């Protein structure tokens, strides 16, 4: 299954965010193959636990968006690109609404 990211508020998962491709979504995924391990240019994504949970808060979102934008330049059209776009949308929402992103590994 890989890593899935959910948006949480007060410990509850939020659903039905606007999808960049139209419609709505409630989680982001399909991009874990692109997550660089041990790369100092990706300090937040590099710390995501592929087997457990990693929580990031609103103060992390500016840096996370920068890292996602770098990965978007590497991603090919398809599921990985869509997953990164959804993650970016979630990070933008988290930064303004004071939520939390939860990365859930296998």
Predicted regions and their residues:
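Acidic (Asp/Glu-rich) sequence patches and key acidic residues
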Residues: 1-106
């Amino acid at each position: 299954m890989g890593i899935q990211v959910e948006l949480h508020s007060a410990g509850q998962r939020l659903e039905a965010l606007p999808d960049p491709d139209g419609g709505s979504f409630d989680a982001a995924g399909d991009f874990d193959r692109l997550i660089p391990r041990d790369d100092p240019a990706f300090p937040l994504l590099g710390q995501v636990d592929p087997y457990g949970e990693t929580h990031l808060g609103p103060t992390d979102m500016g840096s996370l968006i920068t890292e996602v934008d770098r990965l978007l330049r590497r991603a090919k059209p398809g599921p990985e690109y869509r997953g990164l776009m959804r993650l970016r949308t979630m990070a933008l929402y988290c930064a303004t609404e004071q939520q939390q992103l939860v990365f859930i590994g296998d």
